[in-house]
Regions:
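Exported/periplasmic ABC-transporter solute-binding proteins
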Residues: 25-67, 71-78, 83-268
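Core hydrophobic alpha-helical transmembrane segments of single-pass membrane proteins
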Residues: 11-18
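Bacterial N-terminal signal peptides that target proteins for export
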Residues: 1-11
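C-terminal motif of bacterial Sec signal peptides marking the signal peptidase cleavage site
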Residues: 19-23
């Protein structure tokens, strides 16, 4: 009787072990991305097409902001980080690598009668030197300055280009591109900055130094407030087969039409 029980137990153990090994051998086809909220339209469109072209693949995007996305890939929490600014030297020194996916304009939004601002005007508005729209030929109304939170790639890019780092005086610091657009569209005295790829018809994008933000003016460099959309990976850490396949697809010329349709300028 004991011999039969031992044989049965051995068969059960082998069966369970076989099941575990079979499960381990089956690779889950997933791609996880984390980071910039400005890249939502671009990365969402690429992920959707990648899923459609590759049966059984699950693509995820976590819109946490550029700084958090960079940290996530560094800590091994996601496959690919997303940043709407170039990596800093200290980030590169930690073994992080950037690959430029596309270029995006940072649109300056307002809902009043002002249609054009100089780069100098914009800097003075955000540092508090210009406080009223009447100083720029607009209505007698206090300018409500809206921006992104610290760590945002859009904020870093905007402040770097306008040379206003650590000088901006914000009325509100919001956590996503969508929040900036919604807030500015509901207040005629507000001004904000947002990804050109995310600007909707409900918000007016002013021209800067006479140049209207568009795919063409970002591409030819005449629109000065622009920055890269970056895929962030970690050197020495090999991507899964599925994640590598997505990375190769997203950075190929084949993805160019999708990136353009999403409102950005493809790097390739």
């Amino acid at each position: 009787m004991r011999k039969k029980l031992k044989i049965a137990a051995s068969i059960l153990c082998l069966t369970l072990a076989g099941s575990v090994l079979a499960g381990c051998g089956k690779e889950e086809k997933t791609v996880s991305t984390d980071g910039s909220t400005s890249m939502e339209k671009v990365i969402g469109a690429l992920g959707e097409q990648f899923e459609a072209d590759n049966e059984g693949v699950k693509f995820t995007y976590n819109p946490t902001g550029s700084g958090t996305g960079i940290t996530a890939v560094s800590d091994g929490i996601c496959d690919i980080g997303l940043s709407s600014r170039a990596l800093k030297d200290e980030e590169k020194s930690k073994g992080l690598k950037e690959t430029i996916l596309a270029y995006d304009g940072i649109a300056i939004n307002n809902e009043n009668t002002i249609d054009d601002l100089s780069l100098d005007d914009i800097a003075k508005i955000y540092t508090g030197e210009i406080k009223n729209w009447s100083e720029l030929g607009g209505a007698d109304a206090e300018i409500v300055v809206i921006g992104r939170e610290a760590g945002s790639g859009t904020r870093d890019g905007f402040e770097s280009i306008t040379k206003t780092e650590k000088k901006c005086v914000y009325r509100q610091e919001l956590t996503s591109t969508g929040d900036v657009i919604t807030t500015v569209s509901s207040n005629p005295d507000a001004i904000g900055y947002a990804s050109l790829a995310s600007v909707k018809e409900t918000v007016k994008a002013v021209s800067v130094d006479g140049v209207t933000p568009s795919e063409e003016t970002v591409k030819d460099g005449s629109y000065k407030i622009q920055r890269p959309f970056v895929l962030v990976t970690k050197e020495g850490t090999k991507l899964s087969e599925t994640a590598q396949k997505f990375f190769d697809y997203a950075t190929s010329s084949a993805a160019g039409a999708i990136i353009s349709k999403a409102g950005a300028v493809p790097a390739n």
